[in-house]
Amino acid sequence: MPVPGTLSVEIPPRYCPLPTARHPDETVLARRTADWIDGFDLELTPQQRARMRGNDCPGFYGRIMPHSPTDRLQLAVDWCTVMFHFDDVHCDEGPATGRAARFADLATRIVRVLEAPDARLEGPGDTMLAPVRDLALRARRWATPAQMRRCAEAHRAWFLAVAWELGHRAARSTPALNDYAHMRQHTAAGAATLAWAEIVDGAEIPDRELSSPEVRALTELAFTTAAFDDDLFSYGKELWVARAEGTAPSGLGLVEILRRENRCGRPEALRAAVCLCNRLTHRFIALRERVLPDASAPLRAYLDHLCHLLPGNLEWGLTADRYRNPDGRTPGAVTTTASRDTDPPADTSPPAIPSIAWWWDPLGGRP
């Protein structure tokens, strides 16, 4: 397959006035996670090891939880490292034929190991279960039973969404924007990512707060906005891979979905995607101001992580090799540039997407 050369994408200005921060021990976290991975027989190729490093999980979680104790944050960084590998190998890449069955088989066993790490499970992909079992056992040193339940359920939601995505890949179909908008938070493992953050924090968020409509709306807003931003970062990768394979870009990304649904060109679709992200960010900030005054200390910590997730993910995504090295063998093949804007968007109304419209009225008209 010929290498298609380099490709550049310029993203229109993203509204995000939230400040960024970095964890001071990201280098330490990176060294420890590399040593941890070496302790398992994952049969990694040199290329896969390079991709693990290039994904920069210390930089990802270090931007979400910049003030967390290093030893505890290591748990989340280790999870991120092995799950990005899982995502690359079993979710995103390679022919779709037969992938769904292999993915489902391994995914169900991963969830079971999180629920019951001492359970004996055998089958294809067993090498992936050893690091997951180690994570589950380490997490139990700090986590409450409710936190471990939330963690397992978050992974189940993630894997269900990936199965939905794999169905579209196998059928070479493009989901409707209305469906994609509410599913994207799950295909991006949003809840799983923050479930580990709660375990790292230690304090359990009261369910009456975490399950309240306004906090649920805030959570979905943050996860979806970050995932849509991932679609912006990965758009160059999608175009590069399509050019290399001589095919049309995948229809499983926000920009392509908007392009096909609105029947417009790629520049117009890219602008529409950024406008949508800007409106979601504005709504998140406005709703956060309503929720924050009455939040408990554990919920405040959770909301702080969400506030760091949005700008941190923007910053991380522009530099992570995950998007710059599209096939794992061509470093720097894709360059994505973007700028941040602190001026609120002109349009802050709910978008015409019924599945997410409730974020603008989480109490259903009640005061």
From Swiss-Prot:
Cofactor: Mg(2+)
Record's cofactor remark: Binds 2 Mg(2+) ions per subunit.
Keyword Lyase listed: yes
Effect of F60A: Produces only minor amounts of cattleyene
InterPro entries: Isoprenoid_synthase_dom_sf (IPR008949), Terpene_cyclase-like_2 (IPR034686)
Residues reported in the UniProt entry to bind geranylgeranyl diphosphate: R184, K237, R322, Y323
Enzyme Commission number(s) from the entry: 4.2.3.225
Pathway(s) served: Secondary metabolite biosynthesis; terpenoid biosynthesis
Effect of A227G: No change in activity
Region (Disordered): 325-354
Catalysed reactions, as listed in the record: (2E,6E,10E)-geranylgeranyl diphosphate = cattleyene + diphosphate
Record carries keyword Magnesium: yes
Residues holding Mg(2+) 1: D87
Effect of W158A: Decreases levels of cattleyene with simultaneous production of several new compounds
Listed Pfam families: Terpene_syn_C_2
Annotated keywords: Lyase, Magnesium, Metal-binding, Plasmid
Consequence the record notes for mutating A188G: Causes the formation of an additional product
Residue span of motif DDXXXD motif: 87-92
Gene Ontology MF, one: terpene synthase activity
Binding site for Mg(2+) 2: D230, S234
Motif placement: NXXXSXXXE motif: 230-238
UniProt note: domains: The Asp-Asp-Xaa-Xaa-Xaa-Asp (DDXXXD) and Asn-Xaa-Xaa-Xaa-Ser-Xaa-Xaa-Xaa-Glu (NSE) motifs are important for the catalytic activity, presumably through binding to Mg(2+).
Role noted for this protein: Diterpene synthase that catalyzes the conversion of geranylgeranyl diphosphate (GGPP) to cattleyene. Cannot use geranyl diphosphate (GPP), farnesyl diphosphate (FPP) and geranylfarnesyl diphosphate (GFPP).
Identification of the protein by name: Cattleyene synthase
Lineage, uppermost ranks: Bacteria, Bacillati, Actinomycetota, Actinomycetes, Kitasatosporales
